[in-house]
Swiss-Prot record:
EC number: 5.3.1.5
Name of the protein described by the UniProt record: Xylose isomerase
Signal peptide: none
InterPro entries referenced in this protein's UniProt entry, alphabetically: Xyl_isomerase-like_sf, Xyl_isomerase-like_TIM-brl, Xylose_isom_bac, Xylose_isomerase
SUPFAM superfamilies: Xylose isomerase-like (SSF51658)
Subcellular location as annotated: Cytoplasm
Top EC class for this record: isomerase
A single GO molecular function term of this UniProt record: xylose isomerase activity
HAMAP family in the record: Xylose_isom_A
Keywords assigned by UniProt, alphabetized: Carbohydrate metabolism, Cytoplasm, Isomerase, Magnesium, Metal-binding, Xylose metabolism
Enzymatic reactions: alpha-D-xylose = alpha-D-xylulofuranose
Keyword set includes Transport: no
Gene Ontology BP, a term: D-xylose metabolic process
Amino acid sequence: MMEFFPEIPKIQFEGKESTNPLAFKFYDPNEVIDGKPLKDHLKFSVAFWHTFVNEGRDPFGDPTAERPWNRFSDPMDKAFARVDALFEFCEKLNIEYFCFHDRDIAPEGKTLRETNKILDKVVERIKERMKDSNVKLLWGTANLFSHPRYMHGAATTCSADVFAYAAAQVKKALEITKELGGEGYVFWGGREGYETLLNTDLGLELENLARFLRMAVEYAKKIGFTGQFLIEPKPKEPTKHQYDFDVATAYAFLKNHGLDEYFKFNIEANHATLAGHTFQHELRMARILGKLGSIDANQGDLLLGWDTDQFPTNIYDTTLAMYEVIKAGGFTKGGLNFDAKVRRASYKVEDLFIGHIAGMDTFALGFKIAYKLAKDGVFDKFIEEKYRSFKEGIGKEIVEGKTDFEKLEEYIIDKEDIELPSGKQEYLESLLNSYIVKTIAELR
């Protein structure tokens, strides 16, 4: 079989002192932490679309990427080559999972029937490669945003025919996700929203979106798909206002339509940025709701107003992200999918590897720091003390629902002074710094 990356060796762990760009400094997949290998804590995944389809095109310029599969001019030959390259890529990086959109892995035909037949051929190739590999599918999804038919949306379109097409496309995507043993299925509504309310039936669109998701739940039950359904919130881009704006908005929608028991969230760092939140905020919201399912690992540029999908290299972000994952009990049917692309000027094949290595190292280091923070309980202890007034006396009565406005007025009306604890933000931020420095110093 053709080798796509002959110049790239299998990536090894060399430790924090290594200067080799094609080696792990902090990620040792077999390092055991809390009784489990690091690779099973992190569950890294390759995003097929950014790694094997993206070619460095932007609105102002042509593709720049040098990719070995581009030697194939026939669309099917290229599709098969990308699949083969995926498995070689994952095996050299010791990544055990991948994610895809249906249209990433196979080209479209003239009709949906023809497209499905093409898709089946590529799925067979993936299944063949899986037989001799430990690479698995983390989650699948359907591309309901690229084709012009979805200009008004998919589930929220003004066309019943387009709604039907989208439903049939998701039906097929669910089938192949199940066939490939996917742990989950993601819904991202890039076109589910509006540009202006002047031409939008907001009520109908939201109701149709709920109808669409309910149909998906029912079909998954029918075919025996037991993977986790995931909503991926994003406030805007490509649509001006998207209905799954953030975790809180999407959860309210699911709750309102009785769908909350079937869905968790796939949280993307850059989407949190676009919503005006920190990555940790979205993860914390999902965690306290019991809905933290999976993560799209990347980072954005705070100076830019769009989804830059950069590889994650910010240790603060990865530490606080993994802190939330640890506090949630870790991943079950989810993981860390690198929804990230190399920069347009990072056009060499080796840059694909370097980008993933950087992200894997940064999350591995973040996990190790977060594990110490969680184990020592430093933030938990401070928070518990800060809110101690609700553990006793009148505060305990408030929490237990044993008081009311009249009783609270009677309690407080003659009190002259209320003593408040200090928030000590500066101390806690410096404590986080100390844990980062200490953890790195202790690593081999």
